């Protein structure tokens, strides 16, 4: 089924080479398999993870349409799709997954046997375009709630579930280390009782999502960032946000000299990971969702001596979506301010350059100039 005939070409944000973005006319996607849908974009996000591809740190075939965050309307449906119909408004998580492999069945969709992140190649273009082909649509899309604007809901495609993932992973490992029982209900387990001191390294968009999640789980949440203007924003999300030179002393004072129970590393740089390790107490927890592209060098004996527990990796959005959505519902006004810029595709080259230089915060592309979405 379809809503009329789609145009043969569409506007798309294309990475032609590292640091070289262009807005081009490209072929409009079509249904390739009966489990596909075609989604017309309402809003598409510019995410910090996009910078790893933009800078050339992650090798992918070029040119390619970039982006992996999208909220939009289904305009075509494959013959074997059962959960969705033309006209449905949906949130598209950043990775297409099969729903049937070992990892998907365990709720670990980030490691799906056939999973593909939008805008990274392997036959799946990115979300920063007027239309998007979504494979295996019955397995990982979510309906768009009516009470939250599309631009705010875009956070649910990646960074808010990722923030919830990194915070809840730290809390679960802390509970495990303390021998506390868990029911298997993720939200109930990690939010049932606030406990422990947490520190978040990095107060960019993902860091703020981690902070808003962590304040539901821990007694105290500290945070730091090298960019001073981000600290005030982190405070609005509930953190005790301090410059790096003041952070360690404050954490030691709050913990009788032990260090943080849990550190959340969301930057993806070796210095941030080493900072997280340094601030964490003996037998504490480090939980990381940072995308690291360089080696991390540290002392094996120091690591042995600290006895830390680690969680590290990519978020399985469907598993963490329910908890993250409640964080969003309870903080709608804060997250509405989270979107700093609403732009159209014609401004992509300019805003990628600004985002790469850390001169702007969360930015979204909106279709048709509708800035109130």
Task: Identify the meaning behind each predicted range.
Residues 2-8, 274-278, 318-373:
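C-terminal hydrophobic helical "lid"/dimerization subdomain
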Residues 27-44, 55-105, 125, 145-147:
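Glycine-rich beta-strand-centered segment in the early N-terminal region that forms part
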Residues 47, 93-142, 146-150:
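Cysteine-cluster motifs in flexible loop/terminal segments that predominantly coordinate metals
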Residues 91, 264, 287:
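N-terminal Rossmann-like NAD(P) cofactor-binding module of classical short-chain dehydrogenase/reductase
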Residues 148-249:
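Mid-domain Rossmann-like dinucleotide-binding core that forms the NAD(H)/NADP(H) cofactor-binding site
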Residues 247-257:
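Short amphipathic alpha-helix with an adjacent loop that forms part of the alpha/beta core around
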Residues 260-266:
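Short SAM/SAH-binding signature in class I
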Residues 269-330, 366-373:
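Glycine-rich phosphate-binding loop and adjacent beta-alpha segment
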């Amino acid at each position: 089924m379809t809503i009329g005939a789609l145009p043969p070409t569409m506007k798309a944000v294309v990475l032609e080479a590292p640091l070289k973005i262009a807005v081009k006319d490209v072929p409009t996607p079509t249904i390739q398999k009966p489990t596909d849908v075609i989604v017309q974009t309402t809003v598409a996000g510019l995410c910090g993870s996009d910078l790893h591809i933009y800078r050339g740190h992650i090798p992918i075939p070029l040119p390619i349409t970039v982006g992996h965050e999208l909220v939009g309307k289904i305009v075509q449906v494959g013959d074997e799709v059962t959960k969705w119909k033309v006209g449905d408004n949906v949130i598209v998580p950043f990775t297409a997954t099969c729903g049937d492999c070992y990892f998907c069945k365990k709720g670990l969709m980030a490691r799906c046997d056939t999973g593909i992140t939008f805008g990274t190649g392997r036959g799946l273009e990115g979300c920063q375009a007027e239309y998007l082909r979504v494979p295996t649509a019955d397995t990982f899309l979510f309906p768009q709630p009516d009470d939250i604007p599309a631009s705010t809901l875009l956070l649910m495609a990646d960074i808010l579930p990722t923030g919830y993932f990194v915070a809840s992973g730290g809390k679960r490992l802390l509970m495990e280390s303390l021998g506390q029982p868990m029911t298997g209900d993720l939200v109930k387990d990690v939010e049932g009782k606030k406990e422990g001191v947490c520190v978040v390294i990095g107060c960019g968009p993902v860091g703020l999502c981690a902070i808003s999640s962590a304040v539901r789980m821990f007694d105290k949440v500290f945070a730091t960032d090298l960019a001073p203007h981000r600290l005030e924003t982190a405070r609005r999300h509930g953190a005790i946000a301090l410059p790096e030179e003041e952070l360690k002393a404050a954490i030691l004072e709050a913990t009788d000299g032990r260090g943080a129970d849990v550190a959340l590393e969301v930057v993806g740089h070796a210095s941030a990971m080493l900072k997280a390790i340094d601030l964490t107490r003996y037998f504490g927890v480090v939980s990381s969702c940072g995308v690291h592209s360089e080696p991390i060098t540290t002392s094996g004996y120091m690591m042995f001596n600290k006895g830390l527990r680690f969680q590290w990796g990519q978020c399985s959005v469907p598993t963490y979506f329910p908890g993250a959505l409640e964080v969003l519902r309870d903080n709608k006004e804060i997250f509405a301010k989270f979107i700093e810029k609403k732009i159209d595709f014609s401004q992509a080259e300019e805003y990628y350059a600004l985002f790469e230089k850390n001169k702007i915060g969360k930015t979204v592309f909106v279709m048709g100039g509708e800035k109130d979405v």
